[in-house]
């Protein structure tokens, strides 16, 4: 048994491995899936990305918090992660944009974290055994009946939590009501964006291209899409298992039947894949970072991309397949593991649709794939 006291914080994995550190952010108990992020920067964007909802994020970069927390870089209205794990938190925020420390931001939003653990050993453990359920415990959460809880009790609490496979999470992060992000300058196109966990930078990137974006709740019916008469339909990123997204999948099929130009990213790629009859599966430890290569097979070009996904669409590079909406093609894959990173419908009689598994809007990350928004613009103009 690891010896610990009330001044400790523990990260407990479902396989019984326990890491001891100190509290960081709020104290208490947090349960979720432990995943690791290899990005060296952009922790504020990571923490506020709705795709991380229900997950305990482990930072591989050894020092976190150097630039504090500002009022401009949030990708949603709040911190989305279930818990946070770092090696060496910065003792001081050093940025003219900072309004508070990372520690203060976590504490004010009730996010339970742990610092001072060997994140390198933890990441190797998750890489070899796969991501798994975990819990962060500190303060009163370390107690059971007034005494320090034994390790076995903490492990049992973790094992009682829900698994990510089969998790229906997008409903917890979608907007409760429709809203509009206006175009910058004169609006030239209108997009209906289905919010299953959309990041703030996505409608911002569209606005820069003269697109007015109507962000819609995940349960929006096709009748509302028809009322808007959009030039295009966008499927956002989001959390959870795509196998649970039956509503968005059915809506996507209705959009394809109406031949509305469609573009999807991340979770949206998985939704489109399911709408086209493809299966999805859970990756061993996922792709989470801002320097992940992707090959576009039509051009044999490589883009360095920002990614955050634990599930993927079934398929192989260059694979062609039949769908009710026209011939389909696996357009992009990751050279690291062959994972599908993009889909498209092809041919003059096919519905105009394509998607990618990565994040062309970055935030944080490289902008190699920003031209995909321009492709979407061209697809919409062709459909006018």
Across the structure, where does each feature detected by a protein language model lie?
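Conserved phosphate/anionic-ligand binding catalytic regions in large, soluble enzymes, centered on
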Residues: 56, 60, 121-122
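Catalytic nucleophile loop
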Residues: 116, 232-236, 256-277, 359
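General beta-strand structural signal in soluble alpha/beta enzymes
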Residues: 13, 36, 58-59, 86, ...
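Amide-donor transfer/coupling interface in amidating biosynthetic enzymes
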Residues: 4-5, 41-44, 50, 64, ...
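Short hydrophobic/Thr-rich beta-strand motif most characteristic of the beta2 strand and flanking loop
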Residues: 212-218
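Short glycine-rich anion-binding loops that position phosphate/pyrophosphate groups of nucleotides
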Residues: 237-241
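Intrinsically disordered, low-complexity, positively charged segments
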Residues: 3, 7-45, 50-52
């Amino acid at each position: 048994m690891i010896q610990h006291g009330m001044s400790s914080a523990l990260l407990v994995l479902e396989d019984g491995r326990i890491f001891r550190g100190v509290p960081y952010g709020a104290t208490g108990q947090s349960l979720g899936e432990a995943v690791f992020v290899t990005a060296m920067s952009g922790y504020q964007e990571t923490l506020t990305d709705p795709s991380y909802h229900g997950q305990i994020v482990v930072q591989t970069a050894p020092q976190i918090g150097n630039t504090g927390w500002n009022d401009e870089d949030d990708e949603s209205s709040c911190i989305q992660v279930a818990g946070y794990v770092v090696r060496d938190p910065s003792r001081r925020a050093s940025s003219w944009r900072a309004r508070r420390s990372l520690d203060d931001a976590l504490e004010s939003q009730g996010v339970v974290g742990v610092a001072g653990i060997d994140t390198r050993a933890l990441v190797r453990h998750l890489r070899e055994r796969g991501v798994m359920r975990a819990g962060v415990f500190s303060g009163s959460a370390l107690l059971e009946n007034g005494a320090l809880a034994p390790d076995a009790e903490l492990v049992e609490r973790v094992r009682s939590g829900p698994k990510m496979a089969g998790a229906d999470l997008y409903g917890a992060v979608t907007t409760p009501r429709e809203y509009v992000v206006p175009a910058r300058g004169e609006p030239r196109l209108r997009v209906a964006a289905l919010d299953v966990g959309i990041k703030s930078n996505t409608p911002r990137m569209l606005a820069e291209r003269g697109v007015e974006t109507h962000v819609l709740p995940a349960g929006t019916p096709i009748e509302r899409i028809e009322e808007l008469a959009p030039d295009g339909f966008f499927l956002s990123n989001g959390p959870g298992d795509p196998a649970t997204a039956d509503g968005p999948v059915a809506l996507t099929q209705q959009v394809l039947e109406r031949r509305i130009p469609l573009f999807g990213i991340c979770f949206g790629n998985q939704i489109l894949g399911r709408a086209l009859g493809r299966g999805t599966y859970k990756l061993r430890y996922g792709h989470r970072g801002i320097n992940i290569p992707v090959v576009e097979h039509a051009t044999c070009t490589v883009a360095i991309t920002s990614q955050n996904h634990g599930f993927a669409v079934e398929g192989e590079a260059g694979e062609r397949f039949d769908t009710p909406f026209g011939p389909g093609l696996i357009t992009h894959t990751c050279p690291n593991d062959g994972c599908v990173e993009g889909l498209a419908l092809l041919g003059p009689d096919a519905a105009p649709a394509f998607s990618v598994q990565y994040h062309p809007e970055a935030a944080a990350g490289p902008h190699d794939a920003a031209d995909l928004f321009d492709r979407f613009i061209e697809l919409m103009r062709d459909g006018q």
